[in-house]
């Protein structure tokens, strides 16, 4: 890909940066914008927010994340999402309408595919149908859509391939790896390439890797683990035609949940951010 990322102004982080200038190491980089519906986020408000972002970003490439599937995160730290399948599909349709003819990167539902491994048979089938319906709507836009497949130690290559096929991967640009996780870029790269080889369809999917917090790789802890570091800066210069970009999908400094000294999931913590910066190699 030959795109230039959109670099947003972090107006809501200016005070933190004044107190901790090192955090500019994060705020100077392009980050993703996450969208969903909830008690304080109506579908209409979300649609208007997306439109404003796209207008500000034009002609540059913003990264958007859809994160609103019913029973999100299986009710764990990042629980929430739409109240019903109908509400969710309405949200997806409005999301697509908000895109217009723009071509942003869209990361579709972090962890929602691998989570099907932990769902009952009927619930898993229902989620699959919902994903396929969403993919059909998203495929009618100009967006570069990537279905999230989790981290490299979650699903085997064969299982990941099977799920992606069932979710109609051929209708979108490809898949995303390591969203909000910590696995080293080299590990993610091999996993993604193996999936691409395994699919072996007429149109081989492309993939992107979240490098926001993988500078020191992963350990056995998934929630605000100690000793992690920011990873490779966002770029489309990956030296591999199947790897579209290294992205900061998870905003470095945003918490994984109220674990290991972190605040509620999604809340920014200057202490978490500073740790990631200080541990950078």
Model-predicted regions and their roles:
Residues 2-98, 251-276:
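N-terminal carbohydrate-binding/catalytic regions of secreted carbohydrate-active enzymes
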Residues 8-27, 152-271:
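Surface-exposed substrate-engagement region within the catalytic domains
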Residues 32, 59-65, 103-107, 142-146, ...:
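Structural preference for beta-strand elements that scaffold enzyme active sites
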Residues 39-47, 85-88, 124-127, 157, ...:
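Solvent-exposed, acidic/flexible segments
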Residues 50-54, 92-96, 131-135, 161, ...:
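Generic structural signal for well-ordered alpha-helices
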Residues 56-60, 94-104, 133-145, 198-204, ...:
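A structural motif corresponding to the C-terminal end of an alpha-helix
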Residues 73-78, 110-122, 145-151, 176-184:
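Active-site-proximal beta-alpha loop/turn segments in soluble metabolic enzymes
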Residues 80-102, 110-142, 157-159:
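Active-site cleft segment of glycoside hydrolase catalytic domains centered on the general acid/base Glu
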